[in-house]
Amino acid sequence: MPLSFKSSSFCLLACLCSASCAFAETRLGGNFVPPITNQGEEILLTSDFVCSNFLGASFSSSFINSSSNLSLLGKGLSLTFTSCQAPTNSNYALLSAAETLTFKNFSSINFTGNQSTGLGGLIYGKDIVFQSIKDLIFTTNRVAYSPASVTTSATPAITTVTTGASALQPTDSLTVENISQSIKFFGNLANFGSAISSSPTAVVKFINNTATMSFSHNFTSSGGGVIYGGSSLLFENNSGCIIFTANSCVNSLKGVTPSSGTYALGSGGAICIPTGTFELKNNQGKCTFSYNGTPNDAGAIYAETCNIVGNQGALLLDSNTAARNGGAICAKVLNIQGRGPIEFSRNRAEKGGAIFIGPSVGDPAKQTSTLTILASEGNIAFQGNMLNTKPGIRNAITVEAGGEIVSLSAQGGSRLVFYDPITHSLPTTSPSNKDITINANGASGSVVFTSKGLSSTELLLPANTTTILLGTVKIASGELKITDNAVVNVLGFATQGSGQLTLGSGGTLGLATPTGAPAAVDFTIGKLAFDPFSFLKRDFVSASVNAGTKNVTLTGALVLDEHDVTDLYDMVSLQSPVAIPIAVFKGATVTKTGFPDGEIATPSHYGYQGKWSYTWSRPLLIPAPDGGFPGGPSPSANTLYAVWNSDTLVRSTYILDPERYGEIVSNSLWISFLGNQAFSDILQDVLLIDHPGLSITAKALGAYVEHTPRQGHEGFSGRYGGYQAALSMNYTDHTTLGLSFGQLYGKTNANPYDSRCSEQMYLLSFFGQFPIVTQKSEALISWKAAYGYSKNHLNTTYLRPDKAPKSQGQWHNNSYYVLISAEHPFLNWCLLTRPLAQAWDLSGFISAEFLGGWQSKFTETGDLQRSFSRGKGYNVSLPIGCSSQWFTPFKKAPSTLTIKLAYKPDIYRVNPHNIVTVVSNQESTSISGANLRRHGLFVQIHDVVDLTEDTQAFLNYTFDGKNGFTNHRVSTGLKSTF
């Protein structure tokens, strides 16, 4: 049975504090003197362990050492080493095992400020396992073995490089698994791999962790700022963020030539796997490589094979720098398949601003070098990557001679976008023209080359816009889009199946003519599209297809690039007919007999109305987007024109998308009206109290309103809550005068569109009542007048196939409310109603209710901006009904229940209305709020409970409804009379 330190007399290192040299104060029992050499033990901690200032440089073995397996079981406790000196002999370390070294079930493992100058580093073993730990932390450790290389004096001299010493040094494998909260390597220093340095055959795995992984400000003197060596480095199925930032290495062995092996000295600012594979696979959290640097190759990642596949979280490689090759990644074989967004930005290198691919990477004996990129469920973009030896020259990828671009693909609605160009070289001996596939294996998205975002100065340098793909580019599916002055030069071109070439303003597909290149092939275009957005501008430039000495053959028909019809048909250029010279075709021969003039299918849409067509003949009476003749005074031969014809002779009819009406803005006036109404209704409590004196009332109010879409107008629904404070004077003759103030807060949702308006209302009311007594009857006249000011904030999200544009707007409403009501026993005067009135103690009432208001104008910010004019509206109704009161016989808390029932017709109305204007083209459309039905039912149930002689409690429910419209209001509160 393995030895277990469990009892209080054998509490392993649990109380080892302030250890110094070999004289450490412990409470282990017996004569304990480190180091401990165990033969296959399992060690359990019984309390948190802290080892501080332990000096073990002179020890002949590790502090804790096993010649076989060793397991440290934390039982939820912590293990901490701070400011300790590891042994220097052989491969000894602070902790080591000849076989498997396991750390399991710790709340935290923390190594801070430790040092080692030996070969073993801090933790050494054949197989090292960290499992089920909350926090794993290594900070400011120094593991600098010297010398880093040794050259013998024999002839021939043999130079050996020592890569081993590091914080973690596995010879066969390292597994970091099920870490729950944090993994942190900060400010560590070593020769190779400040965090991990492993043998060339070792496998390192970070798998199934939920922790945030942070590797920052680490440094090495010879290679791999954080991780070095091994045959495989795997990050898989991790759900937390993975961050490599501000790591770096230098090349202190510059000039040293190892006699054997591949070391990639001074390469990999974060990761260096000279002859192995790096895999970032199926992770859910965001991954970031930023501000890493190296004086040689690969600012962030150096690997012979690099696979980045299946990651759902965003991947960002930003501002990494290499003095030579690959600002972010340097690899022999690179395979990127993203399930989330991936961005390469602001990386710099001498070659390959973001990525360098070539057979010179890794083991020189392996010559196969390939690049494959697939954007699967998110966009991949290269933007702002530069060559550091040529300021102002942009470059995304450099594929050196011998490297092969296998495919560039995007799946479905995803896009692979190159704002920076690609550079491709071929071998000087026996070069071949190989296929480069766009959208391989059924991918159907967009691969885009664009120079959008370049300054006018950058556009003057051809290298900033020109991509060179030395092979025959074949579009298997989806589209290859060349736009915004980007140039793509190839050795041949063909569309296959549903593959489509899309041209935008200034886009050029040309023939590459490098020295010694293999024979080029003809250009065959079976499906051609154009991007109307880029051409419908005054500074547009015709695209070009130039096959040089080869032939160009076109078949099929011209189509519109897939686009958001809302954006397209809002463009001012489509107010009237326009002709666009979209492309000029050049070559030894240009065959277009299979591409005759024709109509372009134009599905029904909102916005400007008209039809598209295309022709090889210049339209003489229709201007170009810049107002000139299409194609200029002397158009080039083989120019293809796209023509927009308006639906009327004068101008294109404009139809606004109902989703953009924004009737919720007009309906916000209805909400303000209802807010005033709800605020005034609950004043009924004050009017019913017959205790004379000065009264103070405090109430809470909640309301729900819903109106279904009707007659082509939007519906709306909302919930609101607030308070009211009132001051009133009650007289003995039932005369009342009062003043109230309050606020309402709520949110209104449009139906059926995704628009939400939040409101904050401030309300002020003046109210009162007085009796009118005659010989035959008594009438009670009451009035309520309220003013409301509301601040509104609108958020709108539009439904689009590939994006969700959003806009925001703010404005205020001013509203007023007046109610004059007369309560009279007229039901007793009518023979038909008298029996019912006497049986139920009914009293009749008739009222006149006035609602009105106006709202300020405003302009939205964000996408698809709209401007709304000042709006206004009002409504007049004449409620008529009856009320009844019941009294409870309770002595301690008697209550009075009042019920009102009324028919409520709207006799005059001007619906709230505005004018909405589309900002991009100044097209205006009148809109109005919901068209509520004019006949409704009003029910109010009110209960007053006398808590004391001078204090009453209220509970009030009101239903105000029409066909398709419902308004529920609930209030409760207290009143005190002085």
From Swiss-Prot:
Residues 1-24 form the signal peptide. Disulfide bonds: none annotated. Pfam families: Autotransporter, Chlam_PMP, ChlamPMP_M. Gene3D superfamilies: Autotransporter beta-domain. The lineage of its organism: Bacteria, Pseudomonadati, Chlamydiota, Chlamydiia, Chlamydiales. Keywords: Cell outer membrane, Cell wall, Membrane, Secreted, Signal, Transmembrane, Transmembrane beta strand. GO terms for cellular component: cell outer membrane; extracellular region. It comes from the Bacteria. Belongs to the PMP outer membrane protein family. Residues 662-978 form the Autotransporter domain. PROSITE patterns: AUTOTRANSPORTER (PS51208). The gene is pmp14. It is a peripheral membrane protein. It is found in: Secreted, Cell wall; Cell outer membrane. This is Probable outer membrane protein pmp14.
